[in-house]
UniProtKB/Swiss-Prot annotation:
Family to which the UniProt record says this protein belongs: Belongs to the chaperonin (HSP60) family.
InterPro entries for this protein: Chaperonin_Cpn60_CS, Cpn60/GroEL, Cpn60/GroEL/TCP-1, GroEL-like_apical_dom_sf, GROEL-like_equatorial_sf, TCP-1-like_intermed_sf
Compartments where found: Cytoplasm
One of the record's GO cellular component terms: cytoplasm
Function description: Together with its co-chaperonin GroES, plays an essential role in assisting protein folding. The GroEL-GroES system forms a nano-cage that allows encapsulation of the non-native substrate proteins and provides a physical environment optimized to promote and accelerate protein folding.
Gly residues: compositionally biased ranges: 536-546
Name by which UniProt lists this protein: Chaperonin GroEL
Bridged cysteine pairs (disulfide): none
């Protein structure tokens, strides 16, 4: 086991806080509409330019191990806030730094860190309750666009495209962000259900321009095993052929003789068919096949339920208005499923979302809900260079998370004003001891810090602006983008309540841990001996005859 170095009391805290300051000072330069960019070196490829707090935080690793403890703890604040609320990472970092710096002064002056923490917790609870009172629900498309614009560093085009996407697929719908091919942002909306499986043979294509197999008013056969023997399929194929309608086959796989027969019939125009593999794997595949069956009004033909392929009838097949099968995706538009059955299925999946323990499972379940309930919107981010693409894509993703948070818990006035207005609720508090009162006082000062940082980044005098805003009421605040004092909600300067709340709670949590730490232990780096010099070249090779 490697030797350790241990530091106690102020010696440990001072070194750790040095690390907190290095990370926080790098991150906080990005805050506000006039925040600056940070350039991140990459071991491979071009450097990344970003104005995203969590991207900056994730890149910072300090050489001094005690300083690195501080940096990693604040990095954790940024990451947690990003995971929970999707935005507010810079605000959380600024708050954590302010609480730690103020708190250390009290600890050095002999205040009890545990009581300080209790005071901090009381003040944070009061501030959170006040934020909930200030919060107003987001209802209009314009408000969604405003929240998205603020989170995307005042880029109105990003706010608008997110609002359009939410209009089209609903607030529950899935919105994904992908690299675009042009210079402008584009929005693609897939109505109905899309899954990531394409045709099993290019011979199924009947629309060469779009390179898709388009089926109008088709039947849908859903089978949970492989199909290789055409005899199993013949009875159902004959029934479909008599109805003169196309057929989509979704199965674990269609291969050999069965696939060849389908292709030949398709080319000859005897029966218009297309075959695709079932989406997903294992239990998720079963669930997705069931979703498709409910959406199209069919059933999953499965031996587990005592059904067989050769006895399948038209009543057991699903139906849809139109299905398009591309090389990689299949889209089912306007399935013939019963709306009550679809609603019941969505309700059932929502229960599973609440019980899901992993983020991955939750995300996949939410995708299933969206596919059943609304559709999928894809925002394609356009940019001139790869560096710009990465930076812009990160901003779009941030803005998307922020708008979701706003829809969830509502919005408050942005620009650091909501936290400043929470001061009154904190000022009315009284702790059980003088040390707890010091913790409350500490938060009173810390909640000013986001506004101070926004103003400093805009090149103005922070104390003057803070006093002017404190003399106003309600949503009156400083708009750093225009340099004016105004009603921020009317101007569209909004922050999601969830983002502001999460930033404060996470910052206070980690800062309290640092203040109550009395020792720090790190591993001593081994001084490895220098490598011996390389031996000289091999002698005696001169006389060799080639």
């Amino acid at each position: 086991m490697a030797a350790k170095q241990v530091l106690f009391g102020d010696d440990a805290r001072v070194r750790i806080v040095r690390g907190v300051n290095v990370l926080a000072n790098a991150v906080k330069t990005t805050l506000g509409p006039k925040g600056r960019n940070v350039v991140l070196e990459r071991s491979f490829g071009a450097p990344t330019v970003t104005k995203d707090g969590v991207s900056v935080a994730k890149e910072i690793e300090l050489k001094d191990k005690f300083e690195n403890i501080g940096a990693q703890l604040v990095k954790d604040v940024a990451s947690k806030t990003s995971d929970n609320a999707g935005d507010g990472t810079t605000t959380a970092t600024v708050l954590a730094q302010a609480i730690v710096q103020e708190g250390l002064k009290y600890v050095a002056a002999g205040f009890n860190p545990i009581d300080l923490k209790r005071g901090i917790d009381k003040a944070v609870s009061a501030a959170v309750a006040e934020l909930a009172k200030q919060s107003k629900p987001v209802t209009t498309s314009k408000e969604i666009a405003q929240v998205g614009s603020i989170s995307a560093n005042s880029d109105e085009s990003i706010g608008k495209i997110i609002a359009d996407a939410m209009d089209k697929v609903g607030k529950e719908g899935v919105i994904t962000v992908e690299d675009g091919k042009s210079l402008d942002n584009e929005l693609d909306v897939v109505e109905g259900m899309q899954f990531d499986r394409g045709y099993l043979s290019p011979y199924f294509i009947n629309n060469p321009d779009k390179q898709v197999a388009a089926l109008d008013d088709p039947y849908v056969l859903i089978f949970d095993k492989k199909i290789s023997n055409i005899r199993d399929l013949l009875p159902v194929l004959e029934q479909v052929a008599k109805s003169s309608r196309p057929l989509l086959i979704i199965a674990e796989d269609v291969e050999g003789e069965a696939l060849a027969t389908l292709v030949v019939n398709n080319i000859r125009g005897i029966l218009k068919t297309t075959a695709v593999k079932a989406p997903g794997f294992g239990d998720r595949r079963k669930a997705m096949l069931e979703d498709i069956a409910i959406l199209t009004g069919g059933v999953v033909i499965s031996e587990e339920t005592g059904m067989s392929l050769e006895k399948a009838t038209l009543q057991e097949l699903g139906q849809a208005k139109r299905i398009e099968v591309g090389k990689e995706n299949t889209t089912i538009i306007d399935g013939a499923g019963d709306s009550k059955s679809i609603e019941a299925r969505v309700k059932q999946i929502r229960v599973q979302i609440e019980e899901a323990t992993s983020d991955y499972d939750r995300e996949k379940l939410q995708e299933r809900v969206a596919k059943l309930a609304g559709g999928v919107a894809v925002i394609r981010v356009g940019a001139a260079t790869e560096v710009e693409m990465k930076e812009k894509k990160a901003r779009v993703e941030d803005a998307l998370h922020a708008t979701r948070a706003a829809v969830e818990e509502g919005v408050v006035a942005g620009g650091g004003v909501a936290l400043l207005r929470a001061k009154q609720a904190i000022a009315d508090l009284k702790g059980d001891t003088a040390d707890q009162n010091a913790g409350i006082k500490l938060i009173l000062r810390a909640v000013e810090e986001p506004l101070r940082t926004i103003v400093t980044n805009a090149g103005e005098e922070a104390s003057v602006v803070v006093n002017n805003v404190l003399n106003g009421k309600g949503n009156y605040g400083y708009n750093a983008a225009t340099g004016e004092y105004t009603d921020l909600v009317e101007q569209g300067v909004l922050d999601p309540t969830k983002v502001t709340r999460t930033a404060l709670q996470n910052a206070a949590s980690v800062a309290s841990l640092l203040l109550t730490a009395e020792a720090a232990v790190v591993e001593l780096s081994e001084d490895k001996p220098a490598a011996p010099p390389m031996p000289g070249g091999m002698g005696g090779m001169g006389g060799m005859d080639f």
